[in-house]
Amino acid sequence: DELVGLKRNQLRMYRERLTEIKDIFLNPEPEDGINGAWITSIVFGKSYNLKKLDAIKKLAEMDIPARPFFYPLSSLPAYPMAKVKYEPMNPVAYDISSRGISLPGSAILTEDQIDWICEGIKKLLDARSL
C-alpha cells in the first residue's frame, strides 16, 4: 500500500504540473478501479509529430532520463512474422507505442526532480510547437 501510494502521488504530481499542456495523455484513471501507477507514462499527441526515441534523446540532453513506452509484442524481433499479421489488428497499440515514453519514477524521486522533469517536457514540446 505504501509503494502504491507513493507511485500514485508521483502520477498526481506529474498530472498537476502538465495539466495545461494540450494533446498529451498520462495514465488514465479507471472508473471502476484504482490505477496502481507503477510506471507513469506520457503519450504525445499527433500534433507534436514526435516519436518516442526522439523525445528520449532530447530529454537526455536536458539530463532527464526516460524510457520507451511499451512496444507491442508482435513488433519485437523475437516474432518476425507477427507484425504483418497483428499490426492491422492492433492499430492503437502500434500508434501509441510510437509516441509514448515512460517518465522517471524511482521511489526516491523528489518533488523538485519532478518539477525539473516537467519543465523539460514543457521545453521539449514548446520547441516542437514553433
What is each model feature region?
Residues D1-L130:
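PLP-dependent aminotransferase class I/II
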